[in-house]
Each structure stands twice: as C-alpha cells, then as structure tokens.
Design a protein with these regions (language model features):
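Non-catalytic, conformational "gating/processing" segments within enzyme and secreted inhibitor domains
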Residues: 71, 79-101
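Helix-start/capping segments and mature chain N-termini
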Residues: 1-64, 68, 96-173
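Active-site phosphate-binding and catalytic loops of NTP-dependent enzymes
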Residues: 75
Length: 173
C-alpha cells in the first residue's frame, strides 16, 4: 500500500535508490518458478555498492521472495507469455538536506501481473540510434539499476516514440 515520506526524504532530493526486476511464472506442470533470483539480487548489490546503500543478504532475499510469491501465487497469470513481474527496490528515507549516504532505508517488493515486455513479440522492432544524448560514461553509474539512469533516458525515448521507433540504441558519444 501507500507509504508516507517526509518532504526532505533523501530519495526525493538525491536519488539514492536502486531497483531490480525479475519474473515469477507458471511452468507447464503448474509449478511456480522464479527466473534467476540469485543473479538479480547479486546485481542489486552491485548497484547498492555503487550508490553507498547497504548490501542485502542474497540468500535471505531469495528465500523471502519465494515466500512472498507463494503468498501471492494467485496473481501469477497462466496465459502464454505472461508472468508476475517482481520489482525489489531500496531507497534512502531519512529526512536530510545535504549530500551524504542515507542512514535509513526502505526495502520493498512490488508485484504486478504482466504480458510480454515487447508487444511486437518476435517481430522486428525499429531501433532509434541516439547520437546527441549520453546515457552512460566510463566510471559513471550506467551499469546500475537506479532511477536517475532511466530518468535521463526519457528525452531520447520521447524522441524515438515521436518518430515511431520502439527502442533506443545508445552510442554514448
């Protein structure tokens, strides 16, 4: 459900947050499977380390995610090419104006039934080659899954959509 944040919460001013994405789906025999949860939580920790967020216990997160999915298994669709999308995320919640790593964090998982990521399926997609804007630079945060990386891509995505392209290929200068 909704959460309450102080207007000075560090996430709102300094963007100290990371997220991951993974899927739970139903196998043909009805079993519920998670796709590479260990790898997702390891990648979450790579992002955490880069943004000075405490690391999570990968094994514990995988186990708790399995329990969470089992509790919400009725939300896992059974139609072809569907799944339950899981979005674990962590953000600095302490109210503080001034740049420093947070001291208090929320860790949550959102779950949502989804269809195919690309509605085109296996059909070819039109790719817009971005030459003006840069998404990542050597030594930067481009390898992390953090909101700022996606926010900075919105302008190029809007241009691509306006020109009827499906996705952006970043040349990064």
């Amino acid at each position: 459900g909704p959460i309450s944040l102080d207007p000075a919460a560090m996430i709102l001013h300094y963007g100290q947050e990371v997220f991951e994405g993974m899927k739970a789906y139903r196998a043909v025999d009805g079993r519920i499977l998670l796709f590479r949860p260990e790898e997702n939580f390891k990648r979450l920790n790579l992002s955490n380390e880069r943004l000075c967020i405490p690391l999570v216990d990968v094994e514990k997160c995988v186990e708790l995610t399995k329990q969470f999915v089992n509790l919400d298994k009725d939300w896992i669709p059974s139609a072809p090419d569907t799944s339950l999308y899981l979005r674990p995320f962590i953000f600095a919640s302490d109210p503080h104006l001034g740049v420093r790593p947070g001291k208090h964090y929320y860790f949550m998982i959102i779950a949502s039934p989804v269809g195919p990521y690309y509605p085109e399926g296996l059909d070819p997609v039109k790719i817009y080659v971005e030459t003006e804007f840069v998404r990542a630079v050597k030594g930067g945060t481009g390898f992390t899954k953090t909101g700022g990386n996606y926010a900075s891509s919105l302008k190029a995505q809007a241009v691509a959509k306006e020109k009827h392209y499906t996705q952006v290929l970043w040349l990064d200068g």
